[in-house]
Amino acid sequence: MSQKILFIDRDGTLIEEPKSDFQIDTLEKLRFEKDAIPTLLKLKNFGFKFIMVSNQDGLGTPSFPKENFEIAHEKMLDILKSCGIEFQDIFICPHFENENCACRKPKTAMLEEYIKHELYDKEQSFVIGDRESDMILASNLGVRGLRYGELSWKEIENEILSSFRSASYQRTTKETDIKVKVCLNGGKVSIKTGIDFFDHMLEQIAVHGGIGLEISCKGDLEIDEHHSVEDVALALGACIKKALGDKIGIARYGFALPMDECLASCAMDFCNRPHLVYKAKFKKSHLGALSTEMIEHFFYSLSYAMGVSLHLKVKGKNDHHKAEGLFKAFAKALKMAVKIESENLASSKGVI
């Protein structure tokens, strides 16, 4: 099973690297980089595993005795363990660069088992290091590299936590071909379904939900809009669910009451027990090319694809405003529910 893994360099990234001899061979030289420990603790709580990958030039030679290295190295590991941080594996290359060995970073021989058996999730794993060789290693592993020094540990934390809340999803049937991209932390908005009013409503989800949203839909509109609206809902719901991953840390619940001359409300729970309560009446049969009866069907399909319990209701005079109010209320509730506000799962059962 592939895991979310951080491949972490040691000297100059996790702990300070002495500029005098580039060796940490005494306890006096052992100092942690700022915010390294609290960042790793937080990332651990979001399900990341840690692997140390380090080049130690000449380790075991008279210029760098192994026993001297191990004194500081073991102390470092003891400190990390006392804080709740342990490495799943530790890989150290002891060779000089001119020895042209197979294991020295950025080569990947030390990580061959992880590559061969696909033990890491390429989309959700990272290399963290302070040298160009670390960035080349990231490329060789097919993951993203984050360069410490250019980024602080807190900035690295933000980069990682934001990037894994994105997803892409494609749904292709005989009636439709739909592509969806979602970034729950914001981003580009581009929506083209062939139904202008529906595009306008979907834009409300992106803008008022604070999410990046790209949707393209090619559907059988020559028949009617039913398949396009339904399948967009299914694809969007599946994509949001995929972007949330294990849901650790999310608020889980959302509630919103935007008001104009109409009153629209939405209550949402990411409980994985899909259900829709929908209370809305429209005087018109269509808004633009969108049938008003398809609005309920959209939210029904969306709630089941997302795995949420969803309560929507609206009252007012203007049908356009009522429809827009429903989508805005949903967007605001979604923004609240997916916000990361802790490091735990919002469930006494331990699962959502």
Swiss-Prot record:
Residues 165-352 are annotated as: Imidazoleglycerol-phosphate dehydratase. Pathway: Amino-acid biosynthesis; L-histidine biosynthesis; L-histidine from 5-phospho-alpha-D-ribose 1-diphosphate: step 6/9; Amino-acid biosynthesis; L-histidine biosynthesis; L-histidine from 5-phospho-alpha-D-ribose 1-diphosphate: step 8/9. Keywords: Amino-acid biosynthesis, Cytoplasm, Histidine biosynthesis, Hydrolase, Lyase, Magnesium, Metal-binding, Multifunctional enzyme, Zinc. Zn(2+) binds at C93, H95, C101, C103. GO terms for biological process: L-histidine biosynthetic process. Its EC number is 3.1.3.15, 4.2.1.19. It catalyses: D-erythro-1-(imidazol-4-yl)glycerol 3-phosphate = 3-(imidazol-4-yl)-2-oxopropyl phosphate + H2O; L-histidinol phosphate + H2O = L-histidinol + phosphate. Its cofactor is Mg(2+); Zn(2+). It is found in: Cytoplasm. CDD domains: HAD_HisB-N, IGPD. The keyword Secreted does not apply. The active site is at D9 (nucleophile), D11 (proton donor). PANTHER family: IMIDAZOLEGLYCEROL-PHOSPHATE DEHYDRATASE, IMIDAZOLEGLYCEROL-PHOSPHATE DEHYDRATASE HIS7. In the N-terminal section; belongs to the histidinol-phosphatase family. This is Histidine biosynthesis bifunctional protein HisB. It comes from Campylobacter jejuni subsp. jejuni serotype O:6 (strain 81116 / NCTC 11828).
